[in-house]
């Protein structure tokens, strides 16, 4: 296993690392060593999770060996540390630490790594990656009771019902699983020393008996690394429940952090819905009755069961309901808005202040226990646990948010808002004649949640994702300094991706999904016909993302409506789409989503069809976290920018808040405007959607932006950094069809590792080994057989030289694993020989793509508006219906006859043959047959050119015939292709095929490539 020394730390990595992976680990170590926050963007497939784990754990090991046996272990040794440059252990214990037993003094000396991701399934993948490394830290993974409860009855419940039932049974010691945790932990002190996920803990519970949920809580008190979902850390209530975690000097890593700011803002906000408030009033009344009954039957004088307390609580809630209903709302669209600190004035009229809120919270806590006991009065050790929900806990959470820390300074980041709710016809409140209103207190500074971590004394906060861009706005939103930043390139070659902006459809009508045009019939039809053609060109799986569910429904309904068809075609647009791909539509209801995924998988497996098409929405479930690798996602179409509804009160107030904040800030300080935030939120959703395809090193696919607004530089600058070099804006739809068809024709022809079946596991499509670098370059990435050409792993010209110099300073600590026989030459420039780096060996250039770089910058002309077909390869590709027609002898005719009367070959009647004894020389023989000239020249070209170069040459010839490429660009490309010394016979011999009126131009090009510069 290779070991890389980066910033003085020896990092064990399970495979030979790509240069971009070394760069990533370098930034992680910079953040950890210097105690700075970091924003790290690296595309999916570049192994960021593996890099995070290896670099962070290598840094942690410099403080001492990993914990063993309930926190015991190495005792401050070197543990594979990095020598004198390593940091010393901390000299003092964290003030907020809570450790148990003898492990406290030792483990508190070392920083704990807390690794958070959005979902349990994502954490499962992270732990799987940990198992692939050589690191074996003491670890724990936190999960909810829904994932971990094994009690026969409680496991069937959900949410607060499950939590309350669990609390009650544990309090009564009626849960045998909870009762056996302490003894199990004493007898299994090594638990956590090997990587184990939630499923492993559940299996232990089912076979051995102890509760997996409480095992994980015990393990979390003394660990090297802790895995947890976002909400466990960001939500104040959940964070309070994590007793024993040493926050001081801890490292927080947020993976998949592209939505972190919205999660933070939502955690600090609340919406008090009218039905929730009514339920709270009903629960307060129930508490009164329970207390009265308890006093009567038990003759108890316990103040905790004083019904007067709950009568006061009920009266307060009813007064709050009445006060909300009396708020004057002038406009249903705008609602009633006040500055954030108005909430204190509003509540003070009900005698709810910072002081009285503490008593209210105590009363609500008592009510929660009372309701648990009351609803479980008949429950015994062998009886079912009853489901209970304490809505009053919602009021408790609201009071915590409003009176956090006992101060009011945070209110300046909020807006107070009251608005009328949409009512159903059977709404109980409407029947009672009450006004149905929602009281909201919205936080517009996501940085408040991050501030809490700083107060806890964390050392570094690392945010990473494949789609963090734009980084500046994210840093401004979170109100944190992020001195360490990275926008990594991808590890794929440039011929593995096609990115195009399609501004118009087949008829030339603009594609623009803005509110001005998206409702028009012409736009919907043009978009539909555009998708029909892409459904035919793209093999296997195709994803189509709409800005919203509403827009998706309207377009699909339009395509299905035969009355909207204004052509002679007997089929609707929807039927024509289904002719090429079997459709699946993302459901609005989350409960139906697994069925949609299974349906898509089944249709992909169906060998009688040409694939499936998944219609989905940006910010929906398809766009978040699913892995459409290989056949599951060969292309993604984005039909427009998913802007939030501008009239939505929360969106409108957020924009207004940012604009006012910017106008009040110092002119020298950077501030985010409301408009910038509005655009960037949409752009980030698009970036997340397009990230569903091209999921690993050998994957390939196309990204198609079907909206003319993506041509704008303002929009392109918001796209992920790694994607920008590949973007090409087309003017004509024919150019798009030509380029896309050629891309997939070339990829399919060399794809020798096509999966035979589709595997959907844990809602992840076509699972691929995302991080394991390959020793050799896949056939998907190789475009030439020329041994002198280097195959690129990414295109990033601006960083080529700087990366080479930087990586030359990083020496591999494990030299033997990086020798030539171990394949290092195929991954990086870290070739070690003695005490010096060797750069003589063959290396892969990470910054240039020689195989296709000569195509960049050429301008393609459009076909005429009346031309219904474009020539691509050896096929006629129609824009719409009709089977492709093979053309015989295309290559020969491209030379011998395609230029017609303009060719000098037709006037000279000459042919080209090889001169005996002079390999490669070309002579003209007057009086020869013109028909022999083309095949003879092609034969020589095949001998002199690589496979990819020969293919490019034929394409240039077709461009000359069809006039789809400017003549100067075509001739320049051909002359450049023939310019090497061994190909000069081709350069000279091609003269006979140049049109007469461009012969002088070709002569100039020949001279420029053959006359040496002086």
Curated annotation (Swiss-Prot):
Q: An example of a Gene Ontology BP annotation on this entry? A: regulation of double-strand break repair via homologous recombination
Q: Which UniProt keywords apply?
A: 4Fe-4S, ATP-binding, DNA damage, DNA repair, DNA replication, DNA-binding, Helicase, Hydrolase, Iron, Iron-sulfur, Isomerase, Metal-binding, Nucleotide-binding, Nucleus
- Composition-biased stretches (Low complexity): 86-106
Name the enzyme's class.
isomerase
SUPFAM superfamilies, per this entry? P-loop containing nucleoside triphosphate hydrolases
The catalytic activity of this protein is classed by the Enzyme Commission as 5.6.2.-
Query: Which InterPro entries does this entry report, sorted A to Z?
Result: ATP-dep_Helicase_C, DinG/Rad3-like, Helic_SF1/SF2_ATP-bd_DinG/Rad3, Helicase-like_DEXD_c2, Helicase_ATP-bd, HHD_RTEL1, P-loop_NTPase, RAD3-like_helicase_DEAD
Annotated [4Fe-4S] cluster binding sites: 149, 170, 175, 211
Q: Which family does the similarity line name?
A: Belongs to the helicase family. RAD3/XPD subfamily.
Can you name this protein? Regulator of telomere elongation helicase 1 homolog
Q: Which Pfam families match?
A: ARCH_RTEL1, DEAD_2, Helicase_C_2
Task: Give the top-rank taxon of the lineage listed in the UniProt record for this protein.
Answer: Eukaryota
Report residues binding ATP.
42-49
One GO cellular-component annotation of the UniProt record comes to: nucleus
Which positions fall inside the Helicase ATP-binding domain? 7-308
Q: Where in the cell is it found?
A: Nucleus
